[in-house]
Amino acid sequence: MKRLVSTLNLPKEDWLRYRKCGITGTDAGAILGLNPYRSAFQVYHDKISDTIENIDNEAMRQGRDLEDYVAQRFSEETGFKVRRANAIYQSEEHPLLLADFDRLIVGQKAGLECKTVSPFSADKWADGKIPAHYLAQVDHYLAVSGFDCWYVAALIFGRELVIHKIVTDKQVLSDLIDEEERFWTNHVVPQIPPAPNGCECDTQQINQMYEVDNRDKTADLSALHGLLDKRQELSDQIEQMEQEKTAIEQQVKLQMQDAAYGTAPGYKVSWVSSESKRVDSQRLRKEQPDIFNQYSNNVSSRRFTIIHAA
């Protein structure tokens, strides 16, 4: 591998722009369909777009701030000395593959990926498990670096530090490289988007792309007639299953009667009373229009409906 660019004093916008030039570790799981928070459809649009999306949130901020601490704990647990990479790296054999490493391990052909984990997600790290999209990220780093192994140190808030060692598997890396290069060649280069996969992140991406409707335009969807039929079939099945599910819940309620809680092998059931206050918006609009307008926000969205014409 080679250093593509130093990240010391590199503005974040420039760093994000460099990442558009190839496939990075965080792209790998999305391209493989393993990332629950990001999809191949989103990766594609990020790569072809000139827009630099500087997305940040509290979880990402904490992950950055605690990276030093996780690396320090890893060194304490293992005795390995680590150092910052301070660069975007590029595979010399497969130049499309780029990587930002959290840490490199001194004196070894190995690296370290630092993670912070909510205790609510601790089960995903139990019994030696690693979330699939993180494993794909590490395999990508192994493909770029040519190293022998990679470590993942995951700090589960308030509980423990979990350390895993991932050893290079040449067949796994070969398959990953093939998938990543196929994605780039078949989609990014010809600018042909991959099909969305039904995840919420793809819905958000599509809604963002087409925020405003054209009331004077009607699209011909004849080519999608088969898909629309399939959707209708699925809708009918879901409706039937929802009714069956509700009928079971009704039987459970009849058995519970006035009991707030119920138990069965492997299940805990609750049926408890609660009270809530809701604003009568219609009355407020009528009797206090100034106050209603003062605390009202205009929200723009496109409502999507499909009606089956028998």
Give the residues covered by each predicted segment:
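Accessory terminal regions of nucleic-acid processing enzymes
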Residues: 1-310
